[in-house]
Amino acid sequence: MSWMLRLQERLLGISPWNADKITDEWFRAHFNYAADLAHDWLGRSLNLSQAKLLNFGCGDGITDLALVLRHGATSIHGIDIRQEYAKLPRIAREQLGMSRIPAALSFETIVPNSPLAGRHAGYDGLLSWSTFEHVQRDKVLPILADLHACLRPGGVFFLQIEPLFHSPWGSHLRRYDDVPWHHLMASEEELWNTIEKHEGPLDAAEVDFGFADFGADGYKRFVFKEYQALNRLTADELIDIARQAGFEVLREERRHVDMPIPEALQGRYPEDWLRNNEILLLLGKP
C-alpha cells in the first residue's frame, strides 16, 4: 500500500490542504504548537526534508502530519500501543480537507515494552511528545536504551514531557479538576469523586479524538486509570536515566510555573519539583 501511495503522490502531489478549515482545538494545538516545537528542536540538527524520523508514542498522528505538511518532513514512522492514528485520514479530511494523508507517514501498533531496535534501525531522529510519563517506571531505562539502538550515530532525540507529575496539574486530570496540586493533597478516592461528579463541557483543547470512543463516563474512568499509572518521574530522574541509556544531553529546557504553593505542600516536596511543569530535551547518540 505504501508504494501505491507514493506513486500516486508522485503523479498527483500531496493532497491539497487548508488550515483555515480547522475547527477542533485539540487538532489546532497539535498541528501548530506541538509540530512547531518539535521542528525547532529537531530542525537545528537535522534537515527534515532528508531525515528518517521515528515518533515514539505518536498518538493520533496529527503532529507527524504537520511536520510533513508544514515543515517538509519526508519520512516519519509513528509507533504507539493504541491505534488512534487509524483515525488520521478522517481527521485530516474533516480538519484540512485532505483526500488522503501523505505517503511520508507510516504507523505501527506495538505491544507495550516490546523492543524495536531489531527491526527499526538507522533513524536520523526520534521524537516523543508527552509519552514517557506514562511508561512503567522500571521500563523507562530499557525502552530508552532500545530507542538509543534505533538511532544512527550522530542522530538526535527530541523528548518532551508536560505536565510533570509534581507540577500543579501533573495528574493529567485538569479537564475535570482545575485545583492546582490537588493530586498531591487529596486521596485517590477524593480525586475520583471530583472527577465522577464533574458535569458540563470540557475545555475543547483537552478533548482528544478518542473521547467519543469511551463516552463521557468511560473517558473519566480511562483518564483516572492513566493517572494511577503515571510513573511520577522528575526531570532530574529522566535525564539521569537517559544518560544511563547511552544518550548525551545536547540541549535542555525546564519550564516552571509562577504561582503560590499551597501551605500544605511546603516542605513536603522540593520547590523545583512543584514548579517544574515541563521538560524538553535534545538527546544525542555519540
Where are the regions a protein language model picked out?
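Class I SAM-dependent methyltransferase Rossmann-like catalytic core
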Residues: 6-46
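Conserved class I S-adenosyl-L-methionine
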Residues: 50-59, 158-203
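Class I SAM-dependent methyltransferase SAM/SAH-binding core
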Residues: 61-115
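A short acidic, Gly/Pro-enriched loop at the edge of an enzyme's catalytic core
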Residues: 115-126
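A short glycine-rich, Lys/Arg-flanked "PGG" loop and its adjoining helix->strand segment in the class I
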Residues: 141-153
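Short alpha-helix
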Residues: 229-246, 252
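Core SAM-dependent methyltransferase catalytic element
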Residues: 245-247, 266-286
